[in-house]
Each structure stands twice: as structure tokens, then as C-alpha cells.
Amino acid sequence: MDGIERAQFDHIGVITEEQHDGEVFVDATRVWVTSPRDHPFHVEYLRFEPDSPVTGPLRNDPHVAYRVRDVDAAIAGHDVLLPPFEVGGGFCRVAFVMVRGGVVEFMQYANPDEDGWF
């Protein structure tokens, strides 16, 4: 089995221009994010800085995120929007791909049993 077959829903990412309580800055993509663990429906809000290198669907469209065992295996064969990178000082590795016209984030947590947020 590959990383996709072991995927588990993690959150939905929604683009916003409004500041939200508890935002954390992700330097690699220059975006402020909220913890979906603090939202009753696991929504993560993303607020991009004007100088963010992120463009296109990843910056403009919502995404659905899944936990996978192997992010490299999960992205194989997909149109990669943003290749794997670390967030939270090694808390997890993430990558973004297009799947049938929608943005999908694959997340490989350093600790697969992790329930928190970086």
C-alpha cells in the first residue's frame, strides 16, 4: 500500500484576508495559519503575506488535508503544486498537489499518533 491508501482526513484549509486568533506564521510559505484543532469542523484559516512565494490554486483555492505515512509516496503521480517541506521545526512534512481539479495537502507527522498542532 502507498501513502494515499493509508490517508486519514486532517483538516480543510480556507483562504482568508482576515486575521484570526491563534495564528502561527509558516516562514517557508510566508502564510499565517490557525490550528484546525481549535475549530469544531477542523477548518484551518490561511492568510498569505503579500510577498508569499505561493501562487495559483494553492493561494486562491481551499484545500483538503490528509495524514499519510509517506508524503513522498503520496505525491507520486500527481501534479505537485508545492513539494515536501518541513513545518513546525520537524513537527511534520507537507506537500500540496492537484487531484482531479482540487488542491490536496498530504501531511506526514513525525509522530504518527500526534493529535496536536505545531
Residue ranges and their predicted role:
Residues 1-50, 54, 73-100:
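Core segments of cupin and vicinal oxygen chelate
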Residues 15, 65-69:
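Short hydrophobic/aromatic beta-strand micro-patches
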Residues 42, 65, 103:
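Short hydrophobic-acidic sequence motifs that mark active-site Asp/Glu residues
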Residues 52-54, 65, 112-116:
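A short local loop/turn or secondary-structure capping micro-motif enriched for an aromatic residue
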Residues 56-58:
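A generic structural micro-feature
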Residues 60-62:
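Eukaryotic phosphotyrosine signaling hubs
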Residues 99-118:
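Short, Lys/Arg-rich amphipathic alpha-helical interaction segments
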